[in-house]
Design a protein with these regions (language model features):
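Conserved glycosyltransferase catalytic-site signature
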Residues: 36, 59-63, 150, 157-160
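A general structural signal for well-ordered alpha-helical segments in protein cores
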Residues: 35-36, 128-136, 157-160
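A generic "alpha-helical surface" signal
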Residues: 29-30, 126, 151-155
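NAD(P)-dinucleotide binding in Rossmann-like oxidoreductases
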Residues: 53-133
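Predominantly a Rossmann-like dinucleotide-binding segment in NAD(P)-dependent oxidoreductases
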Residues: 1-52, 170
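Phosphate/oxyanion-binding loops and surfaces in catalytic or ligand/nucleic-acid-binding neighborhoods
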Residues: 45, 49, 96-100, 160-166
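Active-site rim elements
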Residues: 25-27, 119-122, 143-147
Length: 176
C-alpha cells in the first residue's frame, strides 16, 4: 500500500501559522499525519517506522515513511514543496482480489480477473463535507465518536513522534 499528499507550502494560514513549526508541527504533523492515520485504521499498529525528511521551509517538509507490518511495508509520502504545486492526494492499496487506486479525485478498482477495471459510484461522497458533518454531529451530541476516538488520534501522534526520531537518525527504524 502507498499513500501520498502533496501541496505547496501552506503560507495561507493565519499569521503564517503553518510555517511556524512550533505551532503547526510542520508538514509531517499537519499534512502527512492523515496518511499515517488511515494506514493505522486499515492495517493496525505498525511494528516499526522508518522515515526520511528534508527541511525546506520549516522542519520535516518533504517526508517519506515506511511503516512495517510483519513484512508488509506500507509507504507514505508527504510534501510541502514547490510554491506552484496544487494540493493533491493519492493512494493505492492491494487487497487479496483487487487493487484500489485513488488519484485525480477518482477511485478505480482493478480486480485480479474479471470484471474489467471500474470506478464505483460513490454518491454523496465528498471527504471534506463528510468529515465536517461527522465532526458537527459528534460535537452537537447527535452521535458518539466510535470511528476515530481521541485515543486513536493520540496514538497516531505517537507514531509521528517516532517518525521524527527516525528522520533525525537518518532513517534508522524506530519501534512503535
Amino acid at each position: 500500500a502507498s499513500f501520498g499528499r502533496y501541496s505547496n507550502p501552506a503560507t495561507w494560514g493565519w499569521e503564517n501559522w503553518f510555517m511556524d513549526y512550533g505551532k503547526s508541527g510542520g508538514c509531517i504533523t499537519d499534512l502527512h499525519v492523515h496518511d499515517i492515520d488511515i494506514a493505522r485504521y486499515l492495517f493496525g499498529e505498525p511494528k516499526s517506522v522508518s522515515c526520511r525528511a528534508v527541511d525546506t521551509n520549516t522542519r520535516y517538509d518533504i517526508v517519506q515513511t515506511v511503516l512495517e507490518y510483519d513484512g508488509l511495508p506500507v509507504m507514505a509520502e508527504g510534501a510541502w514543496s514547490s510554491g506552484q504545486m496544487k494540493f493533491s492526494s493519492c493512494y493505492r492499496v492491494d487487497f487479496e482480489k483487487a487493487s484500489v487506486v485513488f488519484e485525480d479525485g477518482k477511485v478505480t478498482v482493478y480486480p485480479d480477473r474479471d470484471p474489467a477495471p471500474y470506478t464505483p459510484k460513490l454518491e454523496g461522497w465528498d471527504g471534506y463535507t463528510n468529515e465536517i458533518a461527522f465532526f458537527s454531529d459528534v460535537v452537537s451530541g447527535k452521535i458518539t465518536n466510535e470511528r476515530n476516538p481521541a485515543s486513536s488520534a493520540a496514538q497516531t501522534i505517537r507514531v509521528i513522534e517516532r517518525m521524527k526520531a527516525s528522520a533525525d537518525a537518518a532513517g534508522k527504524p524506530q519501534c512503535i
